[in-house]
């Protein structure tokens, strides 16, 4: 069995408010709105994040994205008024930061060493 797609779910209390925030995070509107409770962004050919209205579990997500240029990613966030935590270096030189959405869901963003 081969995994061909990954959809990383992010439970939120208010889908419409979350869509606005994630539009700023990603820099564009959702690629897919399958129903009134979900909205999804395609980040890679086979990797997606999606928000889903689920107030009982809102704030419980922890996902990780790896980018090729963390500094450029952070500059884009700053332009779109999205706050990120401090950048730390972990392991064998992976630089990471954490972005937390209004519900408390955490998105760790890292750049592996060159």
Identify the role of each PLM range:
Residues 26-33, 83-87:
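Short secondary-structure junctions
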Residues 40, 48, 64, 84, ...:
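Short hydrophobic/aromatic beta-strand element in the GNAT-like acyltransferase core
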Residues 21, 59, 71-76:
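Short amphipathic alpha-helices within nucleic acid-binding modules
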Residues 28-61, 106-111:
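Conserved short beta-strand elements that form part of the metal-binding/catalytic scaffold
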Residues 1, 10, 79-114:
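Vicinal oxygen chelate
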Residues 18-23, 77, 104:
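Conserved active-site tyrosine of GNAT-family acetyltransferases
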Residues 2-4, 55-60, 90-91:
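Short glycine-enriched loop/turn motifs at secondary-structure junctions
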Residues 1-19, 61-63, 113-114:
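N-terminal beta-strand motif that seeds the catalytic metal site of vicinal oxygen chelate
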């Amino acid at each position: 069995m081969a995994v061909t797609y990954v959809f990383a779910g992010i439970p939120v209390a208010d889908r419409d408010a979350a869509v606005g925030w994630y539009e700023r995070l990603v820099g564009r509107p959702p690629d897919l709105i399958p129903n009134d409770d979900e909205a999804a962004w395609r980040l890679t050919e086979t990797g997606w994040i999606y928000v889903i209205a689920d107030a009982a579990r809102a704030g419980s997500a922890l996902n990780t994205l790896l980018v090729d240029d963390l500094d450029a990613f952070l500059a884009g966030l700053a332009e779109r008024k999205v706050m990120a935590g401090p950048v730390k270096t972990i392991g064998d030189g992976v630089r990471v930061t954490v972005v937390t959405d209004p519900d408390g869901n955490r998105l760790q963003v890292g750049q592996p060493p060159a």
